[in-house]
Amino acid sequence: MLVKLILIGKLKDRSWETHCREYLRRLGAYGKVEYVELPDSDPQNEAKLIRRELERDRNAEVVVLGEEGREYTSIELARRLPSIDRKIVFIVGGPYGVAAEIKQRADWIWSLSKMTFPHEIARLLLCEQLYRAWNLANGGSYHHLSDEQKQNSRKNQ
């Protein structure tokens, strides 16, 4: 597993940063994790900075977080992500989202929810769900399956 997070802006409250870093540290047990914070700026400059980062990862699977994307359950994500056999780059935009040209470059768009979240919460959810997905895919005990989920999981294997 090789994951890169491209994130616009710095978290102002260090406690959010601490929690995000903890999930990424745990995720590191399953492979390499890169974390790139780009400065908050106007949308065109953010797009330019993201494009520059993507140039370094031309063959990567690109995932943009956006409200118009598809929602996944944790179990669906745990099935999808580990099946990708190349580096995965996740992009979280700034206050105005991600530029259309970056979304067009994306292989898929992932919506955390139909609701809109503050940047800090979206980042923390991303980090936590990535850890949960790989932990679940590797038989870890972090995610607690209901009896029905266990039964469905066995059927789908």
Model-derived features: positions:
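N-terminal beta1-alpha1 ligand-phosphate binding loop
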Residues: 1-23, 27
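Short, surface-exposed alpha-helical segments at coil->helix boundaries
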Residues: 17-24, 47, 100-103
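Conserved RecA-like P-loop NTPase ATPase core
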Residues: 5, 63, 93, 126
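Structured adenosyl-cofactor binding patch, chiefly the S-adenosyl-L-methionine
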Residues: 100-157
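Loop/turn-to-beta-strand initiation segments
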Residues: 2, 85-94
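Short glycine-/acidic-enriched loop or helix-start segments at secondary-structure transitions
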Residues: 15-17, 73-75, 99-102, 121
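Short glycine-rich anion-binding loops that position phosphate/pyrophosphate groups of nucleotides
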Residues: 11, 67-70, 94-97
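S-adenosyl-L-methionine/SAH cofactor-binding core of RNA-modifying enzymes
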Residues: 30-89
